[in-house]
């Protein structure tokens, strides 16, 4: 080894010892001919001092981020010079020998400052030398180890599934990779290991896990990455409660890393209740504002806007004191979410109602409205009217915005909930409106994915009444973030084919796209289920960071660009020719048949 000790490990008990340290020059200070440097390595920082001799002469040329090796004697710092902010703040290293291992060019940004995102990603290798980014990456490693420890106790088998596979759409677009040896044919990068882990269950593995890389070619969305990581788990001969029990054990182990004990069992909430009360299937339960349904209350209203299939309200505590410009800003906020606006009523201090909506209501409606929605004098009541799903979603978003503006969220709190009994299917138009790819050609598509089993009570009727069918699925939500989702899977070919049929996938297409899975079900496929955790999001939550980019070693921008390597990039004409990108499908099929023959 080039060093005897880590820079961050030195303490008073090392005084008098000769040590060799390696690392980077974080700072250099010159005090009356005596040079001090903060020497940083992965473990922390130690102060090195150059007082005399050849090493002191050499130290004059040191600059920020020079990579160096120093040898010297550990000494107690003089009284009054201690640094209580550093674990090594009681000591310093009196350097006798200095070796510059590598010089550094002038820095594009100072590491003790907060540069812009573009600069950070362009020079990510420098960004990772900073304490925050480095801590996030090391925390991620500990998270991986903690999960593996739990799964090892339960005798799970870690299996690597293919990353070059067949295009089998799962709710987003595939990244495609040309097969050079079969021009015109393409591999797809997996959106998840879903089908392979089910095949592992058919293969008798019984308990599988993988820290899996996944790829989805999605349109631009805030804080999404085209490649991301899941902790993927599958188990044979289990029911929903078994998967949830294991998942909670893993979550408890992860949050212990930051000193928090998750109370278990984690409460359950049905999808229908979550949408009704919070307007979201991933509700943030750290604050208590809820949606109040007002459809029945306004059933005879003279106000045409509220003559709608659904009317709901959410209260903003103290919101009546907002100036007009802020109330106008709420309208713009709603329009950005596809709504026409956000109706509101102000509850005055004397209990009377103000605002443009109030004068359109009947006397009886005005009289009882504050009580009905739970508003107090000084509050503002926001309303949404129209189709229930869209209006609840708008009010759910308003609920979160209210909490942020009013300061209702305890940033140190953790709130977990399981969302269960989600619909098995949703209208295909709803999926495409939210930016997903609707699998199939029917009016219906899967809410989770096409391999989720119906609940037992929906098994006989899901294809005749798709809108009422419930999924045997469960999602885990933390502080308004979906951090994992799973389901009991379909393990019978006839049920899987019925699900495909509801989605408009006929027998021929099903065999073409998913025949390998359907064929496997014919050989005694066991009942099975599992869960996948969003690993990037979980690590970001544990690290107290808002963006998953902060916990990925080399992330891309929101638009899928890597400023470090300039990916994606054009390819040469020769590469294009070799990849067979311009080969026609019929030519590819002939070539494939020839090779098979």
Curated annotation (Swiss-Prot):
Cellular localization per UniProt: Cytoplasm
Enzymatic reactions: tRNA(Asx) + L-aspartate + ATP = L-aspartyl-tRNA(Asx) + AMP + diphosphate
Chief location category: cytoplasm
Site feature Important for tRNA non-discrimination, where: 31, 80
Region feature Aspartate, mapped onto this chain: 194-197
Residue numbers spanned by region Disordered: 563-597
Record-listed E.C. numbers: 6.1.1.23
InterPro entries: Aa-tRNA-synt_II, aa-tRNA-synth_II, aa-tRNA-synth_II/BPL/LPL, Asp-tRNA-ligase_1, Asp-tRNA-ligase_1_N, Asp/Asn-tRNA-synth_IIb, AspRS_core, GAD-like_sf
GO CC entries: cytoplasm
Disulfide bonds, paired cysteine numbers: none
Residue sites binding L-aspartate per the record: 170, 216, 448, 489
GO biological process per UniProt: aspartyl-tRNA aminoacylation
Listed Basic and acidic residues bias regions: 575-597
GO molecular function terms noted in the UniProt entry: aspartate-tRNA ligase activity; aspartate-tRNA(Asn) ligase activity; ATP binding; nucleic acid binding
Binding site for ATP: 216-218, 225, 482, 534-537
Top-level taxon: Bacteria
Annotated family: Belongs to the class-II aminoacyl-tRNA synthetase family. Type 1 subfamily.
Quaternary structure (record): Homodimer.
HAMAP family: Asp_tRNA_synth_type1
Its biological purpose: Aspartyl-tRNA synthetase with relaxed tRNA specificity since it is able to aspartylate not only its cognate tRNA(Asp) but also tRNA(Asn). Reaction proceeds in two steps: L-aspartate is first activated by ATP to form Asp-AMP and then transferred to the acceptor end of tRNA(Asp/Asn).
Protein name from the UniProt record: Aspartate--tRNA(Asp/Asn) ligase
Organism: Nocardia farcinica (strain IFM 10152)
Lineage: Bacteria, Bacillati, Actinomycetota, Actinomycetes, Mycobacteriales
């Amino acid at each position: 080894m080039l060093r005897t000790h880590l820079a961050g490990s030195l303490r008073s008990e090392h005084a008098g010892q000769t040590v060799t340290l390696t690392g980077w020059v974080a700072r250099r200070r010159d005090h009356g001919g005596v040079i001090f440097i903060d020497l940083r390595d992965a473990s922390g920082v130690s102060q090195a001092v150059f007082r005399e001799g050849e090493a002191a002469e050499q130290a004059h040329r040191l600059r920020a981020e020079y990579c160096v090796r120093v040898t010297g004697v550990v000494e107690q710092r003089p009284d009054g010079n201690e640094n209580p902010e550093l674990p090594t703040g009681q000591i310093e290293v009196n350097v006798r020998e200095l070796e510059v291992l590598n010089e550094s060019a002038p820095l594009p940004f100072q590491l003790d400052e907060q540069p812009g995102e573009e600069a950070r990603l362009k020079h990510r290798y420098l960004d990772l030398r900073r304490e925050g980014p480095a801590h996030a990456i090391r925390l991620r490693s500990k998270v991986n180890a903690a999960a593996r420890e739990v799964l090892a106790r339960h005798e799970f088998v870690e299996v690597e599934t293919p990353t070059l596979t067949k295009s089998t759409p799962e709710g987003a677009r595939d990244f495609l990779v040309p097969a050079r040896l079969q021009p015109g044919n393409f591999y797809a990068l997996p959106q998840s290991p879903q089908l392979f882990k089910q095949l592992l269950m058919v293969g008798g593995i019984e308990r599988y896990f993988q820290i899996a890389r996944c790829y989805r070619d999605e349109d631009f969305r805030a804080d999404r990455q085209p490649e991301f990581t899941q902790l993927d788990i599958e188990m044979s001969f289990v029911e929903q409660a078994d998967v949830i029990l294991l998942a909670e054990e893993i979550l408890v182990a992860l949050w212990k890393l930051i000193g928090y004990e998750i109370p278990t069992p984690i409460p359950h909430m049905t999808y229908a209740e979550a949408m009704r009360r919070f307007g979201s299937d991933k509700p943030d339960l750290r604050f208590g504002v809820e949606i109040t349904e007002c459809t029945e209350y306004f059933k005879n209203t003279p106000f045409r806007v509220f003559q709608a299939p659904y009317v709901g309200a959410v209260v903003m505590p103290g919101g009546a004191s907002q100036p007009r410009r802020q109330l106008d800003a709420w309208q713009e906020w709603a329009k950005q979410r596809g709504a026409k606006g956000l109706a509101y009523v102000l509850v005055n201090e004397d209990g009377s109602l103000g605002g443009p909506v109030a004068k359109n209501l009947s006397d009886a409606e005005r009289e009882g409205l504050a009580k009905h929605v739970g508003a107090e004098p000084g509050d503002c009541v926001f309303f949404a009217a129209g189709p229930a799903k869209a209006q609840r979603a708008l009010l759910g978003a308003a609920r979160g915005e209210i909490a942020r503006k009013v300061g209702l969220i305890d940033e140190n709190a953790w709130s977990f909930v399981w969302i269960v009994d989600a619909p098995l299917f949703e209208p295909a138009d709803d999926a495409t409106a939210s930016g997903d790819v609707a699998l199939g050609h029917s009016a219906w598509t899967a809410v989770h994915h096409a391999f989720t089993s119906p609940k037992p009570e929906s098994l006989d009727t899901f294809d005749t009444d798709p809108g009422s069918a419930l999924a045997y699925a469960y999602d885990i939500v933390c502080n308004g973030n979906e951090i994992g989702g799973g389901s009991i899977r379909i393990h019978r070919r006839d049920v899987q084919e019925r699900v495909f049929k509801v989605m408009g996938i006929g027998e021929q297409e099903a065999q073409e796209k998913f025949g390998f899975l359907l064929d496997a079900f014919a050989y005694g496929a066991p009942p099975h289920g599992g869960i996948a955790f969003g690993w990037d999001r979980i690590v970001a939550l544990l690290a107290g960071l808002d963006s998953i980019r902060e916990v990925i070693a080399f992330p891309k921008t929101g638009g899928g660009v890597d400023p470090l390597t300039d990916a994606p990039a054009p390819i040469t004409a020769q590469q294009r020719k070799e990849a067979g990108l311009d080969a026609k499908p019929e030519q590819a099929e002939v070539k494939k048949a020839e090779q098979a023959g």
